[in-house]
């Protein structure tokens, strides 16, 4: 993403959320990548996991306290390097 796109996303997040709040991040990762994902989100107050019916993937929801839209984008930047990760 470029700087303009980041600023637009931060503005949208800030318009739709009253910070600080608990923000829900949703990801799908290949089975076996959950620990890597969890290690990058130590601030999560709650983590929900649901394996796919075939067992190849796991869907995760992380409930994390966030103080701003910029913090939210920082989390997405942190997890971006995980192979096979889908952000929802």
Regions found by a protein language model. Name each.
Residues 1-59, 65-88:
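Long, contiguous binding/interaction regions
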């Amino acid at each position: 993403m470029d700087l303009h796109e980041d600023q637009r996303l931060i503005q949208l997040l800030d318009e739709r959320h009253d910070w600080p709040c608990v923000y829900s991040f949703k990801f799908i990762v290949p089975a076996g990548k959950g620990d890597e994902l969890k290690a990058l989100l130590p601030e999560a107050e709650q983590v929900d996991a649901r394996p796919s019916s075939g067992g190849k993937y796991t869907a995760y929801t992380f409930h994390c306290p966030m103080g701003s839209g910029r913090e939210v984008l920082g989390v997405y930047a942190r997890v971006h390097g995980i192979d096979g990760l889908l952000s929802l």
